[in-house]
Curated annotation (Swiss-Prot):
GO terms for molecular function: ATP binding; UMP kinase activity. Its EC number is 2.7.4.22. Homohexamer. Inhibited by UTP. PANTHER family: URIDYLATE KINASE, URIDYLATE KINASE PUMPKIN, CHLOROPLASTIC. Catalyzes the reversible phosphorylation of UMP to UDP. It catalyses: UMP + ATP = UDP + ADP. This is Uridylate kinase. Belongs to the UMP kinase family. The lineage of its organism: Archaea, Thermoproteota, Thermoprotei, Thermoproteales, Thermoproteaceae. UMP binds at residues 38, 60, 107-113. It comes from Pyrobaculum arsenaticum (strain DSM 13514 / JCM 11321 / PZ6).
């Protein structure tokens, strides 16, 4: 059984949390693909580039390289991981054919790491995509601004798409983009969204539990 784990870049802003993820991934059985976000390094570099007038494409490249640096850090902590960070799908598939664990970051400008994770999950026919996010579950609205937002333990992709497209959700309500959702939906890949600060949730999913929100076709 193959799993894909998307780790929010914010996880990499916490050294102890990164070490805990590595500890858990080293213990997990089966095959695992991990996609790392860019985190504070990406935000800082992009902010400077934007201030200096760099193009959006160049800003995206900075985010991609930051995510690859985070991926390389995780690789250094894993026992069975492929030693290089794949830069595109072809390189990822080559690595996947050789190693039990493959860790990657962004692939190309204009494409989120969430979309990379969805494409990877589709390519390896993953049993599920696990999204270690900046929020503990999917809500009907942004719970940080709307105290009446409802926590949704289980939902379908159609409902999830409606929530993501809601005008009430600000950019800071980071879950996954609609392009990534469309990929997961077309291949009917189950997605789990949980709090990235609790890496133990990965083990919970493997045990058949739902630590946050479960999204299905």
């Amino acid at each position: 059984m193959a799993l894909v784990l998307k780790i929010s870049g914010r996880v990499f802003d916490n050294e102890e949390l990164v070490l805990k993820y590595a500890e858990i991934l080293n213990k997990l059985p089966g095959r695992i693909a991990v996609v790392a976000g860019g985190g504070e390094v990406a935000r800082r570099y992009i902010a400077v580039a934007r201030k200096g007038g760099a193009s959006n494409t160049f800003q995206d490249l900075l985010g991609i390289y930051a995510s690859r640096l985070n991926a390389l850090l995780l690789i250094s902590l894993l026992k069975d991981a492929y030693a290089k960070v794949p830069r595109n799908m072809e390189e990822f598939l080559e690595a996947w054919g050789r190693s039990r664990i493959v860790v990657t970051g962004g692939f190309q400008p204009g494409q989120s790491t969430a979309t990379v994770a969805a494409l990877v999950a589709e390519a390896v026919r993953a049993a599920a995509l696990l999204n270690a996010a900046n929020i503990d579950a999917v809500y009907s609205d942004d719970p940080r601004k709307n105290p009446n937002a409802t926590r949704l333990s289980e939902l379908k992709y159609d409902e999830f798409e409606r929530i993501l497209r809601s005008s009430n959700l600000p950019g800071g309500y980071e879950l996954i983009d609609t392009w990534a959702v469309s990929i997961l939906k077309r291949s009917c890949i189950t997605t789990y969204i949980f709090d990235g600060r609790t890496p133990e949730a990965i083990e919970a999913v493997v045990r058949g539990e739902n630590p946050g929100s479960k999204i299905t076709c």
